[in-house]
Amino acid sequence: LPTEEELADLVPAKGSVTWRLAGDARLLGGAGYALALQVAHPTVGAGVAQYSAFAVDPWGRLLRTLDYVNGTIYGGPKLAGAIGKRVREVHRTIKGTNADGEKYHALEPEAFAWVHATLASSIFETGRRFGHTMTRDEREIFWQEWRRLGRLVGVRDRDLPEAWRSFEVYFDRMVRDTLQDHPTVHEV
């Protein structure tokens, strides 16, 4: 996790691409998109099925995710750092055996990075649907800002693609080769 000195460099600046895009309340419409992509990952799906209260408190789950996104983007470095530590700590004890009989841990780098990546995709895709067109340079800036935000929760740079175009390839590969259709996907 980042030091206090590093926090200011990780939080998007006021008026940045991420700051402007993520502030559109209409992007809430992408929450289901992100959640479905997240839980389709076998590790995330197992953790959600075994530990999450989404089934009994879906609105609470949504609000906690919104608190995370809004707090890390708009809350300033100190709040963003505290949120990052809390998210990491909450996930530290989430582990078990998935539906395929394989052991999992919520902090597996691939799965943890995937959750972060789905939020970027949701913001981008939902924003695009509402007319937030971005130039190639803006997409790249957004992705670099989003990668830095990932460091707040301990997502390592090496677990996310370096550039937006690489992200698109990574995203398609994850959907094609890693995500699974299992009961948790249908429950959310």
What do these predicted ranges mean?
Residues 1-188:
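Mature, function-bearing regions of proteins
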